[in-house]
A protein has these predicted regions:
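Charged, often glycine-rich, active-site loop that binds/positions anionic groups
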Residues: 237-247
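Short FAD-binding loop at a beta-strand-to-alpha-helix junction that anchors the flavin cofactor
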Residues: 186-187, 251-272, 278
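Active-site/ligand-binding neighborhood in enzyme catalytic cores
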Residues: 1-84
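Mid-domain catalytic core of redox enzymes
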Residues: 78-200, 204, 208-219, 231, ...
Length: 292
């Protein structure tokens, strides 16, 4: 039920790859081992221990910006056309007006969006395949609380359909620097599709509904709430349906003709990968490019 709620599809339609290696090492034996011995016997299907930045995961990307130099980044700059000729990407158009000539393109755009922007367009077969692959969208609802702590859990999961959300986490439990010493926060994840009513609904109404559930769960009281907000994240996760590999292989076979194109990230590779995978992949791309 949790998987169906998370992905929006019956589990019978999902590929085992959607576990993202979290099932690796999972067996009756390891389950018993962890139950008896606890955290010291965590196996590879669970997070186990890991390093976490003092001020949140965003620090990684702040440091990348500092290293590359802020003037080298363009914000509010939507790619609206990707022009190619023969076996090379020649230029990209920004906001339908500014054209940039390029030597090499690295894309983490959702595959379907990338293909839609290609000029000339791909064959109809490729476009039809790209329209059939799906992404799951997420709404984050954030609560800032005048309370020292909620509990010690890294994450809390909610498979019951009576709740809109699937997961709640308390950032302070990752790093104590994520909140003042006498305050905390909760981040609530709501998976959906952009066509769902919940995505299209008034966000203040959504916040109030989630807040009511959290009050009923006794996570905090109304007078402990300092502030709240919500963020929409489109194309947060690729949905790996059964036999998705055949579809993606055809798309990759088509895109392999471009000798100056690299794809990366969850959306670009259509893979349920993680930040450390993306960092490694990005480094490999840059190292290979610097050798050319």
């Amino acid at each position: 039920e949790y998987s169906k709620k998370l992905w929006g599809l019956p589990t019978s339609n999902l590929s085992p790859s959607i576990s993202g290696n979290r099932l690796k090492g999972l067996s009756i034996y390891t389950l018993i081992l962890e139950t008896i011995f606890g955290a010291k016997k965590k196996t590879k299907h669970l997070d186990g221990s890991f390093y976490y930045p003092d001020y949140g995961i965003g620090i990684l990307f702040d440091e990348l910006v500092n290293y590359c130099g802020l003037p080298n980044f363009k914000t509010e700059s939507k790619v609206t056309k990707i022009t190619h000729l023969e076996n090379s990407i020649k230029s990209i158009t920004i906001n339908d007006k500014d054209t940039l000539i390029i030597n090499h393109l690295i894309s983490s755009m959702p595959l379907g969006v990338f293909l839609d922007y290609l000029n000339p367009p791909p064959p109809k077969e490729i476009l039809d395949i790209s329209k059939s692959i799906k992404f799951r969208d997420i709404i984050l609802v954030c609560f800032f609380l005048d309370k020292k702590s909620i509990n010690n859990n890294g994450s809390m999961y909610f498979p019951d359909d009576k709740y809109l959300f699937t997961r709640i986490y308390e950032p302070k439990n990752r790093s104590h620097n994520m909140s003042p010493i006498d305050k905390t926060s909760l981040i609530v994840e709501i998976p959906c599709f952009k066509s769902d009513d919940i995505w299209l609904s008034n966000q203040n109404d959504l916040i109030e509904k989630v807040k009511a559930d959290l009050l009923n769960l006794n996570f905090f009281t109304d007078n402990q709430l300092i502030d709240s907000c919500s963020y929409k994240i489109p194309n947060a996760y690729p949905i790996l349906e059964l036999n998705f590999e055949k579809k993606i292989r055809k798309i990759f076979d088509y895109l392999s003709r471009f000798d100056n194109l690299n794809l990366t990230g969850r959306n670009g590779l259509f893979a349920y990968t993680h930040i450390h995978d993306h960092m490694r992949n990005g480094r490999e791309i840059i190292n290979n490019y610097s050798k050319v």
